[in-house]
Amino acid sequence: MNRVVVGLQWGDEGKGKVVTYLSRYHDIVARFSGGANAGHTVNYGDFKVIHHLLPSADFTKNRGIAIGSGVLLDPQVLTEELRELKEKFPDYSGEIFISESAHVVLPVHKEMDRIIDEVLKIGTTKRGIGPACADRVMRVNVRVAELGNEEKLRYFLEKNLSLKKIYGVDFDAEKMMGDLSTFYETIKDFVVSPVQLKRILEEKSVLFEGTQGVLLDLDVGTYPYVTSMNCSSSGVSAGMGFPVEVDEVLGVFKAYTTRVGEGPFPTELTGEEGEKLRKAGHEYGSTTGRPRRCGWLDLPLLRYAIEISGVDSLVMTKADVLNGFEKIKVCVRYSDGRDLVSLRDLEKKEPVYEVFDGWKSLEDKNFERFVDFIERETGRPVRYISTGEKLEDIVEV
């Protein structure tokens, strides 16, 4: 059985913990998009692990991991995560696969990201994702496949860096050659072609791990305040590099809403209310450390994300954060009364709220009513509920 896990908001929904928990039911966890701009935190009890590139498998159970063609690899980050994997999980014996078609984020991409965001004010993570994607489309970027071939690596680096000089950005190609060659030595035993990866995964039960959230998807998110890649389930096959059969799509959402960076946010709470929610949920980015914008759950946006990503079942996270709130609001529609089929004018939307009595614990009837309401409004069952920070704090409904 193959399943996909996607975020249904603007990322940070808790997908990492959910994927790690669900990986016990699968042979392998595969990343199909994103880069080091993603941050997945998993609390194993005695220690926490934050992954930006490695798939969020349960390494205590030796689940395999695969990185597809659509993932952008930051050499420094991946090297550190592989080192940490050996250090924190010394008995790990799972298989590791990296597609040779995956592209590499270069130091020049991070500098370009910084320069571009000063002008566009998108609020990126400055991890070089956008510029790397642009170079990929322009066919001047370095892939994993080029790292083991000095002649090809030099060719692509020189082409790439010559274009950057237009922007006044200059990097040492020879130093970059050396760094990338060292990186290749670290990963070369894991590198496979897309055909090889396809054959391997066809024999496995695979959990495909999405990054960010549907509302940050390049094509169907809150453009231009989006990431540079596909975050919905439609990106799985393209991101892996071959057609993928999927049996179930699981959509993860918080019991409230958060967002990092710029862009429309109809239910955003400012002032004391927003700060209270931020502190209760420890809402600070795992990649940037920036405080997240916080607001109430937005059902029109949730329904939009569910439909556009073909979600079958739901996973609710951080419901425990709302423990002790006297009243809890949920946006049930917008004041214009229209069905949300486009995010084009989202910044003009005014939320209409339904107010729920709060709960002191997730055993309260009030919480049960809250979950029932969401299931009715979305037409999807809530299959799992995250009840705390630790990996095992998940209830199968």
UniProtKB/Swiss-Prot annotation:
This is Adenylosuccinate synthetase. Its main location: cytoplasm. One of its GO terms (cellular component) is cytoplasm. PANTHER family: ADENYLOSUCCINATE SYNTHETASE. IMP binds at D12, E13, G14, K15, N37, A38, G39, H40, T125, R139, Q212, T227, R290. GTP binds at residues 11-17, 39-41, 292, 318-320, 386-388. Substrate binds at S286, T287, T288, G289, R290, P291, R292. HAMAP family: Adenylosucc_synth. Homodimer. Keywords: Cytoplasm, GTP-binding, Ligase, Magnesium, Metal-binding, Nucleotide-binding, Purine biosynthesis. The active site is at D12, H40. SMART domains: Adenylsucc_synt. GO terms for biological process: 'de novo' AMP biosynthetic process; IMP metabolic process; SRP-dependent cotranslational protein targeting to membrane. It comes from the Bacteria. Its cofactor is Mg(2+). It catalyses: IMP + L-aspartate + GTP = N(6)-(1,2-dicarboxyethyl)-AMP + GDP + phosphate + 2 H(+). Gene3D superfamilies: Adenylosuccinate Synthetase, subunit A, domain 1 (3.40.440.10), Adenylosuccinate Synthetase, subunit A, domain 2 (1.10.300.10), Adenylosuccinate Synthetase, subunit A, domain 3 (3.90.170.10). Its EC number is 6.3.4.4. Binds 1 Mg(2+) ion per subunit. Mg(2+) binds at D12, G39. GO terms for molecular function: adenylosuccinate synthase activity; GTP binding; magnesium ion binding. It is found in: Cytoplasm. Pathway: Purine metabolism; AMP biosynthesis via de novo pathway; AMP from IMP: step 1/2.
